Amino acid sequence: MERKKIILYNPYAVFFDMPLALLAIGTALDPEEYEVIIIDARIDKNADELVLLHAPDALCFACTVLTGSPLKDVLRISEKIKQAYPLLPVIWGGWHTSLFPKNPLVDETCVDITVQGQGEETFKELVTHLAQQLPLENVKGICFKKQGEVIQTPPRSLTDMNKFGRINYELIEVEKYFQKKGKRQFDMITSIGCFFRCAFCADPFVYNRKFSAYTAQRMADDIEFFYKKYQFTDLNFQDETFFTYPKQIGELATELINRNIKITWAATMRADQGSRMSDQEWATCKQSGLRRVLIGVESGSQEMMDWLEKDIKIEKVLFCAAQCKKYNIDVIFPFIVGFPGETDESVTHTVAFVKKLKAMSPGFRTEIFYYKPYPGSKITTNMVNEGYELPASTREWANFDYIGSSGPWVSKEKYTFFQHFKFYSKLGWEQKRIYLAPLAAIARWRCNKNQFKFPWEKALIEFLKPQQKLS
């Protein structure tokens, strides 16, 4: 029996994590029935040529879609496909279509079907229906066009992650990702969803505060299998909240030690999760290779933290920081500034907390981002109800910058202050080049005094190393 060809496309982006979403849906398909072709625009220099090469005999062309520049690339390649092969079904899935199920179908002629939420079972059913020309109304968790009308099917419930088979990384050339990263770093995801209700996050909207994760035994078995097969030295867990069940992660760490898996690893952690870990669990995680955690702080103001519905006390952040310092574990602490109505007092608390964390350990990094009203979050919903206008079309969302710039409600003075503080705090506490030590000392003084006038050091740094801007 001739296998049906499925093209899966990962759009261009500036990061090089393995395409875990595409690997998940590709693995869900029966390899005896389907030939899965993953094309990654970040890795494959001739990505467009490969897409057009495989398109003539493909059953469908599917993309994973993130809002912003990745969406722009998906629009471009989808249009190219439709112009060359107008009858080939084009499917979009991922975060953007989970938040905007119908919009791409209304706005664009190059999209036929969108997928919402967890994709493994949905995509498997979808391609079966396409192959057998069955009515798509019976596939849960999709939107599609039919005779000019956009039809949305009922949502699909979250499936237990342990019911899915081991991810087939043979669908990609793993060595290419090692080469692109410059190290043998392997990517895995062991859970989906999130229990928590953060008001700035879209997760509660997409997954309805549901969560599913591999068991410790399943994680250990998979890691051991991939470790022996790919001989990686570092493991990067891409889970939203990896330490949701701290005891289970402690059990995993013990398994890694007992199985003599010699790696380092990094993962995400909420401060309330880390604060529930015993000293022994921290020590075991470190012994197993834990090198870094990412702990979202968002604000140094408890009042702002409560408004954001983080359900975390700042004291727990400090506890985790102290534990990470004790066990020599690096930390990335992301903060978000520039919320609508954010007070100067809140900013002052955040700046002070950033400096406090940086001073605790040279292995602590703080990343400061500007709030952007991303759909699905409680804050954004309230802003829209109060008259704020979000981008109106798919094309406008493709031009949405949710990383670099601040919202229009942030004054020019406050934006300039944040930009200076971000630059000088990195230079002052994260700079490791010896010849810049004098500038680092000046930068720390500037941050401690909040004195950022005449930023001559920034101009000098950018002159010396224009390819390594610190801001």
Q: Predicted regions: what is each one?
A:
Residues E2-P11, P31, A47, H54-L59, ...:
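Radical SAM enzyme core and accessory elements
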Residues K5, A21, I25-S157, K372, ...:
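Glycine-rich beta-alpha loop elements in corrinoid/cobalamin-binding modules
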Residues F15-L20:
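Short N-terminal binding/cap micro-motifs at the start of the first secondary-structure element
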Residues I38-R42, F205, F335-V337, Y370:
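Residue-level recognition of beta-strand->loop/alpha-helix junctions
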Residues F100-P101, F196, K247, E303, ...:
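Flexible glycine/acidic-rich beta-alpha junction loops that bind and position SAM and/or redox cofactors
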Residues P101-D107, G341-K355:
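Catalytic cores of alpha/beta
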Residues N162, I167-I332, F339, A352:
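Radical SAM [4Fe-4S] cluster-binding motif and immediate context
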